[in-house]
Amino acid sequence: MRVGFLSHAGASVYHFRASIIKALKARGDEVIILVPKDEYAKRLEELNCQIIFYELKRSSLNPLIIFANFIHLKNVLKSLKLDLLQTSAHKSNTFGILAATLAKIPHKFALVEGLGSFYIDTSFKSALVRLNINFLYKLAFKFATKFIFVNESNAAFMRALGLKEEKICVIKSVGINLKKFFPLPISKEQKHAFLNTHKMPDKPIVLMIARALWHKGVREFYEAAELLKERANFIFVGGRDDNISCASMEFLKNKAVFYLGARSDVVDLIRLCDVFVLPSYKEGFSVTIMEAKACAKACVVSDCEGCVEAVSNAYDGLWAKTGDAIDLSEKISLLLDDEKLRANLAQNAAKEALKYDENEIARKYLKLYDESVKKCMKM
């Protein structure tokens, strides 16, 4: 079977689709990756697949550019003669599915990992973009084989838009690499070495890892840090870009928080922390939360969709009110004060994370693909 993975970014395929790709290749399927050429082009070669770079202006709303990109993608897909296409993210899930239909690809799967900033932002521009995205999804619903969701909330939203029940499949999480993310005790010497390197005082570490977007709860994290800065080192890790929804560098350099930028050593930072925090406004099924849980860390997350599915309140973490920095600080404070509670939550978190091994998630995808192909052969 010839299987294509279509994405708007190389990072998405490299970090979140690799386990599925490896599972397909292990059983003899041919895999082709289709992405715009970006900084992950070289790293994707590690997956030993054919890589096709296609044209995509990610941020463009110009209809002429969008149409030109669409025709180019349709022609590329038609030339590949794929049996199955897996897409992810809004443009791939809509234009990709429609292009695949014109290219006569028989099996088309769309993955919704979250609705994104356009469904959080209240500006007039975002409202218009939402209308366009919703319209395109309604078209894609007719032609996709299945829509895969990482949480029930997003499935319910698309169901309300008109997606038929038989086309809905929920596979929670994209999976965690449990060979990389697992509990590993950190010695006092290691922790002190880290604190000294970054000129931090000898205090507990409260860590947040996310893109520096306002809707990830960056402001609430910084405000909570201001309230608790005498009690803990607050560390924020995450890259920023020119997106208007990103926090400014001036804001991020606030003295109450140690901003470390984008890092590749996140597993080491997670193991160093005492409390992991994600005060997001909306999530799909947060990978960083699951990675922190896999490393046996108690988490404080917002009581928003996506986060409440990844963390069970008072069992493997705590919920804080979305957008409420005071409540967030109180929940963090509770874990800083109660070491026994923190340890119990962390133990449960590690146990729960075992259910989301990326290899098990990959098996679920392959089973879904195979069932679709077999059903089609019987018709």
Map each language-model feature to its residues.
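Short His-centered aromatic/hydrophobic patch
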Residues: 87-93, 112
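Conserved acidic donor-binding segment of nucleotide-sugar-dependent glycosyltransferases
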Residues: 313-314, 318-325, 334-339, 354
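Aromatic "clamp/platform" in nucleotide-sugar-dependent glycosyltransferases that forms part
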Residues: 262, 281
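A conserved mid-protein helix/loop that constitutes part of the nucleotide-sugar donor-binding site
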Residues: 14-19, 204-227, 326
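Glycosyltransferase donor-sugar binding loop
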Residues: 35-39, 176, 209, 213, ...
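Donor nucleotide-sugar binding/catalytic pocket of nucleotide-sugar-dependent glycosyltransferases
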Residues: 52, 138-186
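Short hydrophobic beta-strand element within catalytic cores of glycosyltransferases
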Residues: 298-302, 311
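A short helix/loop element that forms part of the nucleotide-sugar donor recognition site in Leloir-type
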Residues: 182-200, 364
